Amino acid sequence: LKGKVSGVQITQSSGQPNSDSKVRIRGIGTVNNSDPLYIVDGMPVGGGINYLNPTDIASIEILKDAASAAIYGARAANGVVLVTTKSGSKGKTTVSYDFSYGWQNPWKKKAVLNAHEYMTIMNEMQINDGNAPRYSAADIANNMVDTDWQDEVFNYDAPVQQHQLSINGGNDKMTYFLSLGYFNQEGIVGGNYGRSNYERLSVRSNSTYKVFEVEDRKYLNAVTVGVNLGYTRDHSTSVEANSEYGSILGSAIAFSPLVPVYASEEEGESILASYPNAIVKDGKVLSLPPSGFQELTNPVAQLNRPTLGRNNSYKIVGTFYAELNILPGLKFRSSYGVDLAFWGYDGYGYPDYLGTMTHTDASWVQSEMNRGMRWQTENYFSYNQTFAE
């Protein structure tokens, strides 16, 4: 939709896999919530439409003006996004399978100081404060450490894959559309450590069935029932995003290039003697930050912390309806929709030490589960007739 609908702004909240897209219709409506109302197959859903498999979507319509959105009341104050999923069609049963596999890379690195530039600017700072230079000319000339922390944390060629299986068909009596989708994305920061990943499994069944249809009768001559039912299971892990200080990317940009990723063997032994919970990878101790770096720590050590948490989400959205032809042009429709969601978090951690302001002193474990449900029932008549054509 981005760039295709006037007056609609769509931005991604972060580069995290499956990060929400912010949709703004007619600008920002309120301070706390400017999200539009999402309607999927006639059912208002909470939490956006990230749960949907994009290949299951047949059409998306945006209601921007107050008149067209008036039927939804105050809920439509920020606009309405109408989503219609695919339905079956008459004809032979068709089975299709689609597969895609690709790679992702950071499109740009932040320009930061290398080791030589860093020592030079630090000396200038010391001199401007009336102090002696921190690094001598020999230190600058003989320095052998020049760590590019962005290269150390970026997960280059992070894979993303998608599988889609669908079955479509029908006859004069019924139509059906069935789909099974799987999507997996590895994040470009922390994805190779299992810390920034997204996995979605989706199942959909849309069907209609004509209970009866009598062509030679003008009243009560047809009844149609239908079911649109979708289930989605999401699993995701994430790193801290949009944070200047203390996060993995924040440290990768601001941390000193003079600090090596791993401490020397002698220094590593000294670190473990003072801090037994320091991070060790492949038998090597990851460097600790020098004094004065406050919350900034070795970003590679952050990726190797003995902690891990996963967000879980399970969502079922269904619409059940029946439609009766009463008279020519006059129909009655009754529908019931439900949005049932379960979401939670499971995580654990062990004691660790990354710096004076970043450490965990005790093991912990956490598990939570939430449930939310909304339902809607609609009963209405519609009349469609053309006069004096």
Predicted regions and their residues:
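An active-site-proximal structural segment forming one wall of the substrate-binding cleft
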Residues: 330
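Surface-exposed loop/interface segments of Gram-negative outer-membrane beta-barrel transport/assembly proteins
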Residues: 90-146, 190-198, 202, 208-315, ...
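Short, small/polar-rich motifs associated with maturation and membrane association
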Residues: 1-205, 209-225, 317-318
